[in-house]
Structure formats: structure tokens, C-alpha cells
Curated annotation (Swiss-Prot):
Protein name (database record): Chaperonin GroEL 1
Role this protein plays: Together with its co-chaperonin GroES, plays an essential role in assisting protein folding. The GroEL-GroES system forms a nano-cage that allows encapsulation of the non-native substrate proteins and provides a physical environment optimized to promote and accelerate protein folding.
Summary of subunit composition and partner proteins: Forms a cylinder of 14 subunits composed of two heptameric rings stacked back-to-back. Interacts with the co-chaperonin GroES.
GO cellular component: cytoplasm
Database matches in PANTHER family: 60 KDA HEAT SHOCK PROTEIN, MITOCHONDRIAL
């Protein structure tokens, strides 16, 4: 494949054009009066969304150089979404403002490396300042407030608040589609842990990037599974029963994993392989916990149970299992209730007895997993499109609530960012030359999110930025009510983790764009005849 290469200013300009195209599409969704974006789908009706990252994921540009810029900003949005579940639009708008301000200076002869260093230092300073000014979040109402801001829906916000309070900070909140029109909250017995599928080929729900197994059987294995002859007899028995299979083992590799993947692709057997969490004795103990929850047995050569000899009687079961790339949730395990209750009692006794803090902490983690249960938010809506959008916004709200409990909250509406400019004064004084200019670029960019929140609400962005800069900390524009005031009291808040991720991720991408000297892309294939582009000739 031959390549086309662009250099310095031309390369940067093209990348900037791509950054702008993507950011302009995403920024209309920012704020409580953010607009919707309609996405045409290859199959089925169009999707309507006001979630920045969903819009960003859909965009690929025709010009290969511009597309580089768009993909860079897309990575900012996705990264921020992965860490904090929200704040994607803020990150995108910040990145756009940084690229614009930075490239202006580079074109005027500033040193991009020094500029980039200044931008990074500024991002760190703002991130620290945000952390320092955060208000901790606890209690159902506070959590509900965060979730309400994220989902723009009070009822959903309160559901998330209730769910989080019930299952605790480490508890699992799972979001499912309901078969009715109502959105409701259920608490079920369930266990979640931080290990995801071993291969993306196991995914069954491509939009959510999850493998969902309904009414599966569960194989728990103490050691590695790599040889196919060991696993095959079990796979054949499970395939006959027609049930999906979840395998949790120290590791699944080689032929065994390859066979599971091939069967998943061919749809002959719905299976998902997951590594067991933790190490050594903790892993052993946790597998035993899972065995009790699911009503299965841990297959362990040490106790004379060999994988190739056992039948389906050692398998556990559950109502539903959801596996993503990072975690696994087992809902309503088939184990006996009293066995689980006894195990919980036993763990509590061990916690009382132990004198090692580390052991106590780990035992408490296991206890929380066993006793905490799973909150299931069942989302209902009138149409397929509305259901999708609603489910997305509940997932974002849960992520935002978790982030808020972790690091606290700051005033929302773009004002915390704008007011974090004060943290840059000292830094600016200690730097000189192009690094100091980098700090200026960053200070300028911090007004961008507020500018677009105000613009989307039909106000003059520049006026709003000027006004909020004069207000005391924690005060700003409430774009919902179109008034200025105390945002935290009004419940216009953002999790600090979300805002910080947006700041740090946008700075790292801007720095990349500024220091780009050469861009290399594939040469587009020439069309053999012009059927493909017939519509240009009318």
C-alpha cells in the first residue's frame, strides 16, 4: 500500500480541521440545554443521542489527514469515558480549544515542544486545584444529585442514588433492558469481580461491548486450562444441554481458548472464558465463594477432581451473567440460600478473629461481594431508539455517581474549570518563554466548556465566560434555569474525577497535535470505474 505524506504546517492544519469537524459535531450536546444528534445506522432506524462519546464513535472523515485529527480527539473522548463514564464532551471541547490556541502560536514561530510542556504543567496544576477544591459526596441525596445531572432526569437520578446506597461503594449496579415501559430498581443476590472476557470474540451485545449469558452453567477451575482433550468432554456435555457456559479459571489459553472462540463465532456453543481474580490463596478462597453462590464445585486436581472426568453435576448456575472487558457480574446464582448465609457468617467470624489489618481488609472485600448483592436497574421505554438512549444515560449516571463517591464533586456547568484559572497565575509567574505561553493557551481554553454550554442554551458564550470569571468560587451559570448563582446549592455539579480526566486527556492529545511534524496515511485506492462516485456527475 503506497503512502501519502504531508509535512509541518500543512499536516498540522489538516489535523486541526479534523479535530474541529469532530468537536463541532460533539459540542452541540454539551450542557443541560445541549441539542440532539441524529445518527444514521446501516441497519434499522436512526439513533438519537445527546451523549458526546456516542457521536464521536460514529465519525470517520473522508480526507485521510483530517481523519487523523478526528481519531485523536475521539481517543480523548473514549479515554475520558473509560475512566469516568462521562465528561466526554467537555474533554473534546477542551482539546479543540487547546489545539486551536496552540497551533496559532506554533504558526507564529513558538517552539511546539516548549508549548506542549507548558500545557502539560498547566493541566497538572488545574487537576491538583480541582482535587483540592472538591466536596466529598456521601448519602443518597448527594449521589442522586450527581446522577441527575449526568442523566438529565430526576427520576433516574434518584433510582441510581437508591441503588448505590443499598449496595455500597464497592457494590455492583447493573443496567438491563426491561420488558415493560417502566424503569425500575431490583435488588438481587449476585457477585461481581474485576476480570473481563479473555477474547473480544465472546461479545454478544456489540453496542455495549458485553457478553450476556442468560441462564448459563458455570465451570469453576482452580488451575490453568490449556489442553483441549481435558476440556472437550465437558464442552460436548454442555453443548447437548443447549445452555450457555461461563468458565472461570486461573487462565484459559492455547487450544482450549481457541476452541471456545471458534465455537462462539460459529454459534455452536455460547461460551465465555474469564480469568479468576486475585492470586494464590485469595484466588482459591474466592473460587470457593463463587462455588457456594452458584451451587457448583471448584474443579481442583489436588482434591482428585479432574476436568476430563467430571460430569455436568459440578457446574454451577445463575439467572444471568454479564461480562465486559474489565468485569464480570453473576446475577442470582443457583446456590442454596442457607449455604451462602453460612459462608457470610463464617467470613464475619474470621474478620472478628484476625489481627492482621491486611487480611481483615481482604476478608471485608470478600464479604462485601457476597453480602452486598447486585442492584439491577431495569430500563424501559416506548421505542427501541428511546430505550437505547435511556439505557446509555443510566449507565453514564451510574459511572458518574461512582466517580463522585471516589473523589468528590465540584461546581458544574464549566465554572469549576474556568475558575481553576486562578491556579495558573502562580505557575505562569514561575515559567518563561514558550512554556509560559503554553500556560496562557491552557488558561484561555478553560473557558471553552462554559462558552458552549451557554451558547447551546441560546446565550452569548463570551458574555457568560466574562461574567462567571468574576463570580466567587462555586458560583456560575445554571444553564437549565438561565440564571447565575450558587451551583452546588442548585445541584449543578460534576464529579471531580470526570473533570480531571477531561483536563488531563485533552492536554495530552493537544500536545501530540502540536508536536506533529509529519503525517503519513494510506493512499486512497483508485476506483476502477466510477460507479462508486456516480452521484457527483448528476
Amino acid at each position: 500500500m503506497s503512502k501519502i505524506i504531508e509535512y509541518d504546517e500543512t499536516a498540522r492544519r489538516a489535523i486541526e480541521a479534523g479535530v474541529n469537524t469532530l468537536a463541532d459535531a460533539v459540542r452541540v450536546t454539551l450542557g443541560p440545554r445541549g441539542r440532539h444528534v441524529v445518527l444514521a445506522k446501516a441497519f434499522g432506524g436512526p439513533a438519537v443521542t445527546n451523549d458526546g462519546v456516542t457521536v464521536a464513535r460514529e465519525i470517520d472523515l473522508e480526507d485521510p489527514f483530517e481523519n487523523l485529527g478526528a481519531q485523536l480527539v475521539k481517543s480523548v473522548a473514549t479515554k475520558t469515558n473509560d475512566v469516568a463514564g462521562d465528561g466526554t464532551t467537555t474533554a473534546t471541547v477542551l482539546a479543540q480549544a487547546l489545539v486551536k490556541g496552540g497551533l496559532r502560536l506554533v504558526a507564529a514561530g513558538a517552539n511546539p515542544i516548549e508549548l506542549g510542556a507548558g500545557i502539560s504543567k498547566a493541566a497538572d496544576a488545574v487537576s491538583e486545584a480541582l482535587l483540592a477544591s472538591a466536596t466529598p459526596v456521601s448519602g443518597k441525596d448527594a449521589i442522586a444529585q450527581v446522577a441527575t445531572v449526568s442523566s438529565r432526569d430526576q427520576v433516574l437520578g434518584e433510582l441510581v442514588g437508591e441503588a448505590m446506597t443499598k449496595v455500597g461503594v464497592d457494590g455492583v449496579v447493573s443496567v438491563e433492558e426491561s420488558s415493560t415501559l417502566n424503569t425500575e430498581l431490583e435488588f438481587t443476590e449476585g457477585v461481581g469481580f474485576d476480570k473481563g472476557f479473555l477474547s473480544a470474540y465472546f461479545v454478544t451485545d456489540f453496542d455495549a461491548q458485553q457478553a450476556v449469558l442468560d441462564d448459563p452453567v458455570i465451570l469453576l477451575h482452580q488451575e490453568k486450562i490449556s489442553s483441549l482433550p481435558d476440556l472437550l468432554p465437558m464442552l460436548e456435555k454442555v453443548a447437548e444441554s443447549g445452555k450457555p457456559l461461563l468458565i472461570i479459571a486461573e487462565d484459559i489459553e492455547g487450544e482450549a481458548l481457541a476452541t471456545l472462540v471458534v465455537n462462539s463465532i460459529r454459534k455452536t456453543l455460547k461460551a465465555v472464558a474469564v480469568k479468576a481474580p486475585f492470586f494464590g490463596d485469595r484466588r482459591k478462597a474466592f473460587l470457593e465463594d463463587l462455588a457456594i453462590v452458584t451451587g457448583g464445585q471448584v474443579i481442583n486436581p489436588d482434591t482428585g477432581l479432574l476436568l476430563r472426568e467430571v460430569g455436568t453435576e459440578v457446574l454451577g448456575s445463575a439467572r444471568r451473567v454479564v461480562v465486559s472487558k474489565d468485569d464480570t457480574i453473576i446475577v442470582d446464582g443457583g446456590g442454596a440460600k442457607d449455604a451462602v448465609a453460612n459462608r457470610i457468617k463464617q467470613l464475619r467470624a474470621e474478620i472478628e478473629k484476625t489481627d492482621s489489618d491486611w487480611d481483615r481488609e481482604k476478608l471485608q472485600e470478600r464479604l462485601a461481594k457476597l453480602a452486598g448483592g447486585v442492584a439491577v436497574i431495569k430500563v424501559g421505554a416506548a421505542t427501541e431508539t428511546a430505550l437505547k438512549e435511556r439505557k446509555e444515560s443510566v449507565e453514564d449516571a451510574v459511572a458518574a455517581a461512582k466517580a463522585a463517591v471516589e473523589e468528590g464533586i465540584v461546581a458544574g456547568g464549566g465554572s469549576a474549570l474556568l475558575q481553576a484559572r486562578k491556579a495558573l497565575d502562580e505557575l505562569r509567574g514561575s515559567l518563561s518563554g514558550d512554556q509560559a505561553l503554553g500556560v496562557d493557551v491552557f488558561a484561555e481554553a478553560l473557558g471553552a466548556p462554559l462558552y458552549w454550554i451557554a451558547s447551546n442554551a441560546g446565550l452569548d458564550g463570551a458574555v457568560a465566560v466574562h461574567k462567571v470569571a468574576e463570580l466567587p468560587a462555586g458560583h456560575g451559570l445554571n444553564a437549565e434555569k438561565l440564571s447565575y448563582g450558587d451551583l452546588i446549592a442548585d445541584g449543578v455539579i460534576d464529579p471531580v474525577k470526570v473533570t480531571r480526566s477531561a483536563v488531563l486527556n485533552s492536554a495530552s492529545v493537544a500536545r501530540m497535535v502540536l508536536t506533529t511534524e509529519t503525517a503519513v496515511v494510506d493512499k486512497p485506492a483508485e476506483e476502477a470505474d466510477d460507479h462508486g462516485h456516480g452521484h457527483h456527475h448528476h
